[in-house]
Amino acid sequence: MSQAALVTGAASGIGRAVAQRLEEDGMDVLAVDLQPDPDGPGTPHEADLTGTEANARAVDTALERFGRLDVIVANAGVQHVAPIEEFPVERWELIVSLLLTSPFVLAKQAWPALRDSGAGRFIAIASAHGLVASPYKAAYVAAKHGVVGLVKTLALEGAQDGITANAVCPGYVRTPLVERQIPDQARAHSLSEEDALEQVILAPHAIKDLIEPAEVAGVVAFLAGPSGRAFTGAPVTMDMGWTAR
């Protein structure tokens, strides 16, 4: 029987690349998204993961469809950029629910299946912002730091059952989420969009380039496979030298 994976935020960007790569590697994939792509990789599953029950149902759906669940990739994300005094509380709550509470509920619901796998893998797509901060991103930075703490805890809890838990921490990736940040950053910093990309988005990168989604998917595939068994409780950085500063 093939291994099975659940990938959130799977209709575009990093999640789509991860779902495609894991499927190419022979896994059955439940591709979870608020607006799933029926023509995309994996089996599409619609879910609003800001709700606790939707996360639990997604795990149950994967188990019902595939009969097992070996890999969770918690990738779904959203961003909001604003100074703290202008940051809407409702956006804080939405971001934290999707970026931090959703991975927690997925892990909680899937834990028995990951244990039964014998080599369960929990992989969160965190960010360089799980290790360092930038202004105007209070909710995102707080949630991503929380995800790094979550995988460290899961790694310790899962060690005796062969479960690993890691957080992939990329810099800026060429995704719709990053592209949507450019006008927000331009407004927040009173810059043109072109200058916002050069001076803000890529400023932390020692290598001045965006990361490709397929590159992140390659790291996820490694962590999900047998060669990744020594990695657990780790923030796995791939940030173009951002956190080397």
Language model features: what each stretch is:
Residues 107, 143, 151:
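Active-site helix of classical SDR
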Residues 83-84, 91-96, 201:
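Substrate-binding pocket helix/loop in short-chain dehydrogenase/reductase
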Residues 85, 132-139, 160-161, 208, ...:
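Active-site loop immediately N-terminal to the catalytic Tyr-X3-Lys motif
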